[in-house]
């Protein structure tokens, strides 16, 4: 069977590669068909432009990366798909995997997150960002009465602020130099503060 993957041949030079993929049914691996593949705007922009320094190559490596940051490289880690081959109990299950941009791939079942629930599964493209938000929460070790300011309303910033809100933190503020993003804070019930007034937060 054929599979197609996105590679960066050189700086900002993406290409599509075709490959013949073989799969023999077994109890340990499954075949996943990609439904949605997300691009990390920050990380993958750095990778595509060749701006990963050599001392960061090992740290920045994604789990199923092929090639190197010196190019060519197949990179990515936000994949929402469906199991199309494998043990019967997993068939047709929706999945999230830390896999690059590829139409069809085989993977060890231990590296697959089975998605539960109904609704629009595109929301699971934010899974990697949500993990980062939770790690931020753990690393800060904040107390409920602490005053917290989150700078930047990208996906990670918004998810981090919202996670604090879910955990009943009352003094959480978020800001961004783009004042138009205030409307998103309002929708989520987050406390937006004008970037120019940060000094007055205390």
Identify the residue ranges that each predicted region occupies.
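Extreme N-terminal starter segment of soluble prokaryotic enzymes
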Residues: 1-5
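Residue-level recognition of beta-strand termini and adjacent short loop/turns
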Residues: 9-12, 26
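Glycine-rich beta-strand-centered segment in the early N-terminal region that forms part
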Residues: 23-39, 47-100
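Short loop/helix-cap segments at secondary-structure boundaries that form the rim of catalytic
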Residues: 90-91, 105-109, 182-187
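A structural motif shared across PLP-dependent enzymes of the aminotransferase-like
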Residues: 96-111
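Glycine/charged-rich beta-loop-alpha catalytic/anionic-binding loops adjacent to active sites
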Residues: 110-121
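Mid-domain Rossmann-like dinucleotide-binding core that forms the NAD(H)/NADP(H) cofactor-binding site
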Residues: 119-195
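Short amphipathic alpha-helix with an adjacent loop that forms part of the alpha/beta core around
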Residues: 196-202
């Amino acid at each position: 069977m054929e599979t197609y993957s996105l590679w960066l041949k050189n700086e900002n030079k993406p290409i599509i590669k075709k490959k013949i993929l073989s799969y023999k049914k077994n109890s340990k691996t499954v075949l996943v068909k990609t439904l949605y593949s997300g691009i990390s705007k920050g990380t993958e922009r750095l990778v595509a432009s060749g701006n990963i320094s050599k001392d960061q190559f090992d740290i920045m490596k994604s789990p199923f990366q092929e090639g190197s940051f010196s190019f060519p490289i197949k990179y990515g880690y936000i994949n929402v798909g469906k199991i199309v081959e494998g043990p019967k109990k997993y068939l047709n299950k929706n999945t999230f995997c830390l896999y690059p941009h590829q139409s069809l791939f085989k993977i060890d079942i231990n590296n697959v997150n089975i998605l539960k629930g109904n609704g629009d599964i595109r929301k699971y493209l934010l899974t990697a960002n949500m993990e980062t938000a939770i790690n931020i929460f753990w690393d800060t070790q904040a107390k409920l009465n602490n005053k917290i300011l989150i700078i930047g309303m990208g996906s990670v910033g918004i998810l981090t602020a919202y996670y604090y809100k879910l955990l009943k933190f009352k003094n959480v503020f978020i800001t961004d130099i783009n004042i138009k993003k205030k409307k998103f804070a309002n929708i989520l019930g987050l406390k937006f503060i004008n970037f120019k007034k940060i000094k007055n937060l205390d």
